[in-house]
Amino acid sequence: WESTTVGASHLYYYRFDDRTNRVGERIPLPDGELNGGVLCKPVSYSELPAELIDAFVSIEDKRFWQHHGVDWYRTAAAVVNYCTGNRISGSKFGASTITQQLVKNLSGKNDYSVHRKIQEICWANDLENRCTKEEILERYLNVINLAQGCYGVGAAAEYYFGKPVSALTVAECATLAAITNNPSQYDPYTQPENNKERRDLALDLMCEQGYISE
């Protein structure tokens, strides 16, 4: 199957037809192909402030720089939660790594079957074999749903703060990182208190993990 997404400077189809091409031959599409109220402003990795990367890694995948696509500690905890009836979606942290989240975004597969989860793990491993961590982060931060029709941090920075992503403050970076777990629940406009609570959690985790000081 194919999935439409955003690259560093173009819109692309990422092809998932076969295992050898699992993470994607990229086929350029005409500019403006995405429409219908969807906002996107692709940015390159070099434009992303370190604080933005740190905010997303801190709250979404703290072992991102160490694992190879799957965080087995979180996966094991998720299996225990699932078997005991405590569904992951009700917790502050899911089992999926940033790499796995990117796979979901590119494949369009987001059901919770065991087969789908195993498939996702295999694809995440493929992605890590094909791309650097920086390339994975760039793709991830360009395709994530950040509420209000914004896809990617470039569009969200302009929409919420009226500035390019490179000019975001630490608090603004944390605000965007707070959204992606559940865009409707953490929308800064419609759910400001929820977003603030999770933004503060992101800032606390950034401090705890040594990215910022109090």
Question: Which residues are covered by each model-predicted region?
Answer:
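Juxtamembrane regions of bacterial inner-membrane/periplasmic proteins
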Residues: 1-214
